[in-house]
């Protein structure tokens, strides 16, 4: 019986260098799995973002444990049963019923655990909660709507905003029929549930601010809904990025939400509405002057 020769010195060093390089690559890549730009930060601005973050980390930690067990066992077997000079060729084993049952049942149990955990978190990720006591008041509800996927059990008004993606910016239209809208920056009150209707005008875009929840595609002719609720006391700027390649200006299509107190939101809404009305009146006057000028020339 022929025996397999051990790798020569240079070949052995090459194999060890390759293994060391692979291990180094894994160590270098590991921190990126926790990088803030890729996943919602722990303790984010909204409850659904925090639940997404928890579910992601549970799945990640289970995956890391499986990886370490499998790769550790593989490395142990490579060292423990490595070929030795003068040793006979190892016996060829075809199948091991206990081992095969073990890793099949083990994998099934892991899937069951992940499924159960997912369904525990999923309702709190999908269904918007009621607005809090410090949110938008009933007398400020001209922007609000209770027509939403899962109406709140109690609490204040729900703020509904249409998010319309366009190359290469976002337009935000507030419910209420008073033509309140903004570009680039969405302004919302804290402690108020905000339901978003995400769509697009031209191509597919994807609205994503990690601290406020998962990404949602904006598809022309179709509306996808999501929600977030910035807790009271967490006023500030929340930023994100269009997460769907949508053209040459995709990198500049950023999303921005400014969370303010309900009173500050009311003041901002009144000022913005007045500015829109003034701009409309100015445009109307300009059109009248242009039409009059064209009439005189005719």
Could you describe each region identified by the protein language model?
Residues 33-58, 78-298:
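Non-transmembrane, membrane-proximal soluble domains of secreted or membrane proteins
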Residues 56-81:
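Alpha-helical transmembrane segments
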Residues 1-35:
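N-terminal secretory/membrane targeting signals
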């Amino acid at each position: 019986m022929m025996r397999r020769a051990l790798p020569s010195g240079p070949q052995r060093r090459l194999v060890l260098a390759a293994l060391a390089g692979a291990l180094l690559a894994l160590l270098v890549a590991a921190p990126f799995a926790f990088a803030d730009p890729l996943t919602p930060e722990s303790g984010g601005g909204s409850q659904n973002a925090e639940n997404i973050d928890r579910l992601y980390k549970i799945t990640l930690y289970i995956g890391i444990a499986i990886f370490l067990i499998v790769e550790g066992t593989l490395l142990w077997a490579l060292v423990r049963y490595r070929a030795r000079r003068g040793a006979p060729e190892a016996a060829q084993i075809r199948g091991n019923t206990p081992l095969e049952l073990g890793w099949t049942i083990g994998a099934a149990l892991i899937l069951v655990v992940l499924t159960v955990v997912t369904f525990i978190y999923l309702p709190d990720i999908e269904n918007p909660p009621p607005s809090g006591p410090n949110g938008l008041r009933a007398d400020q509800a001209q922007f609000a709507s209770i027509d939403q996927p899962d109406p709140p059990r109690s609490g204040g008004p729900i703020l509904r905003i249409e998010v319309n993606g366009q190359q290469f910016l976002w337009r935000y239209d507030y419910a209420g029929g008073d033509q309140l809208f903004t570009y680039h920056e969405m302004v919302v009150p804290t402690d108020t549930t905000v339901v978003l209707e995400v769509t697009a005008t031209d191509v597919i875009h994807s609205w994503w601010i990690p601290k406020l929840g998962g990404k949602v595609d904006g598809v022309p002719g179709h509306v996808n809904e999501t929600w977030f609720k910035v807790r009271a006391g967490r006023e500030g700027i929340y930023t994100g990025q269009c997460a769907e390649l949508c053209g040459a200006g995709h990198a500049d299509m950023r999303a921005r939400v400014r969370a303010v107190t309900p009173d500050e939101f009311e003041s901002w809404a009144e000022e913005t509405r007045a500015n829109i009305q003034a701009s409309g009146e100015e445009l109307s006057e300009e059109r009248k002057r242009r039409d009059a000028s064209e009439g005189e020339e005719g």
